[in-house]
């Protein structure tokens, strides 16, 4: 983080996965304590304090839906029950065998865990509650905690509201209309084609439908990849008036600021690109996206217009962009 600041990155938000003893996607909802091998609570506080000294924000990854059999307090009575009385389970993620925690109980675990984090002097700025906004609402038929899908969404929102009440900015995987009142930002909200192979056919013309409704309500970070022989994803970040990802994938090459010349040059270029997107986001982040056009009917030339008059035009033929503020370039 210090190296990135030295390179001119400006204010950053550090999202940390796998920070607790069980490891990433393991042991939820009994995720604490902080990983001993990484310095434990003392080391975690030191990291958070170092971020704050530089004016940066710090947030954690957490999870209150996947319910791992290896969790310290695992009790099958707390799990979702399907209409036929069975308990769903799979072993897809790193933590192995799991079911789903009934959301009626999730707020209790959130209160317990975040209260414990605070007792160690760790002042979280943000928290990412994984999967809540990318999975449909669960139904539960357990007689002790029956739940409809609407009630599931209400309990998930209660988790977000608890964090907000304690000064912690809320985040989850994607964006959903039910979560808008209690969600500050998300992991991402990519177009469908951005989740597929670059050579895969696209299922239509990508347009910012969600942002035409909710742009001023939820901050959306955008991928900044430049696809060889394809699109520069930075253009979609600009069209949507979003925030940029500087580093999205964990990597060991730059650990402890030890960057070789090639990596440093690439990072410097990434910082310059992110500065453009971040600058626009500072201007329009709280503005409504009021219009989006295919310029001249050409789907590869798109323009977004924000409530303050800022217009962003992206030409995907040439992979270029133009930002005009109230008619001036």
Question: Language-model features: where?
Answer:
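Aromatic-lined carbohydrate-binding/catalytic grooves of carbohydrate-active enzymes
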Residues: 1-112, 120-127, 131-145
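Active-site-proximal substrate-binding groove within the catalytic cores of carbohydrate-active enzymes
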Residues: 71, 79-94, 101-127, 131-329
């Amino acid at each position: 983080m210090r190296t990135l600041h030295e390179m001119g990155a400006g204010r950053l938000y550090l999202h940390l996965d796998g920070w607790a003893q069980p490891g990433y996607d393991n042991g939820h909802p009994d995720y604490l304590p902080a990983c001993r091998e990484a310095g434990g609570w003392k080391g975690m506080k030191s990291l958070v304090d170092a971020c704050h000294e530089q004016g940066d924000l710090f947030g954690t990854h957490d999870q209150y839906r996947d319910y791992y059999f290896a969790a310290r307090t695992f009790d099958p009575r707390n799990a979702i029950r399907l209409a036929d009385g069975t308990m769903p389970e799979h072993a897809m993620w790193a933590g192995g065998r799991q079911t789903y925690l009934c959301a009626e109980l999730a707020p209790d675990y959130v209160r317990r865990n975040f209260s414990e984090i605070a007792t160690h002097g760790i002042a979280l700025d943000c928290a990412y509650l994984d999967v809540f906004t990318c999975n449909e609402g669960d139904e539960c038929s357990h007689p002790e905690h029956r739940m409809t899908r609407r009630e599931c969404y209400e309990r998930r929102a209660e988790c977000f509201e608890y964090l907000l009440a304690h000064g912690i900015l809320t985040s989850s995987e994607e964006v959903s209309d039910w979560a808008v009142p209690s969600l500050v930002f998300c992991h991402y909200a990519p177009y469908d084609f951005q989740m597929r192979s670059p050579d895969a056919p696209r299922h239509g013309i990508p347009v910012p439908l969600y942002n035409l409704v909710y742009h001023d309500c939820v901050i959306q970070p955008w991928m900044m990849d430049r696809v060889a022989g394809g699109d520069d994803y930075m253009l979609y970040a600009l069209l949507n008036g979003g925030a940029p990802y500087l580093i999205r994938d964990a990597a060991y090459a730059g650990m402890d600021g030890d960057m070789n010349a090639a990596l440093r040059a690439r990072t410097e270029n990434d910082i310059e690109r992110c500065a453009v997107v971040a600058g626009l986001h500072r201007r329009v982040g709280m503005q409504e996206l009021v219009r989006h056009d295919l310029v001249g009917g050409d789907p590869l030339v798109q323009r977004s217009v924000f409530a303050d008059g800022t217009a962003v035009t992206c030409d995907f033929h040439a992979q270029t962009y133009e930002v005009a503020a109230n008619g001036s370039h």
